[in-house]
A protein has these predicted regions:
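N-terminal signal peptide c-region/cleavage motif recognized by signal peptidases
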Residues: 18-22
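Second-shell loop/turn segments in exported
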Residues: 47-51
Length: 157
């Protein structure tokens, strides 16, 4: 009897862990993505100017996932899993993403058979002009071209 209880308990714990992991990834996937409006934005511990600053972002157009809202505040998560609260006046609808693949190539057209025009390192911020099923047309620095959509964090789905 004790062995059956242990097996049942183990099975229940395993089930809830799997469901919890799956639902967290789905929640992020279906959330709205915005970007930072200014070169310097404060991430706060809670939804008010009374809460302490947790982190200072210093990158305009950094994409963030909106997790929750409270009045004029949005709870966000960035590509490094930092989370906290930002006032809505500091958020923009400008579409941007972060390159998550080492030495990604930007192509002149939306095919790997077109001319490569630049190579991106991990963590590079790109502005999204438009996306197709597998590709996004992006701008970064002096380069405009196409990159594989699955290399980007913060892309339009």
């Amino acid at each position: 009897m004790k062995k059956n209880n242990k097996n049942l308990l183990f099975s229940l714990i395993l089930f809830f862990l799997i469901v919890s992991f799956h639902s967290k990834s789905e929640v992020i996937k279906n959330k709205k993505i915005l970007s930072l409006k200014n070169n310097e934005v404060n991430l706060r511990v809670g939804p008010s100017f009374d809460y302490p600053i947790k982190l200072k972002y210093k990158k305009k157009y950094l994409p963030v996932v909106i997790l929750d809202k409270s009045d004029a505040w949005r709870q966000i998560k960035d590509f490094e899993n930092n989370s906290g609260w930002i006032h809505i006046s500091q958020l923009s609808k400008k579409k941007s993403a972060i390159n998550m693949k080492s030495e990604s190539l930007i192509f002149s057209r939306d095919t790997i058979y077109s001319k490569p025009i630049a190579k991106l390192e991990i963590g590079r911020l790109v502005l999204i002009k438009k996306c197709k099923i597998e590709w996004c047309k992006i701008t970064t620095g002096n380069f405009t071209g196409w990159i594989k959509k699955n290399y980007l964090w913060g892309k339009i789905d």
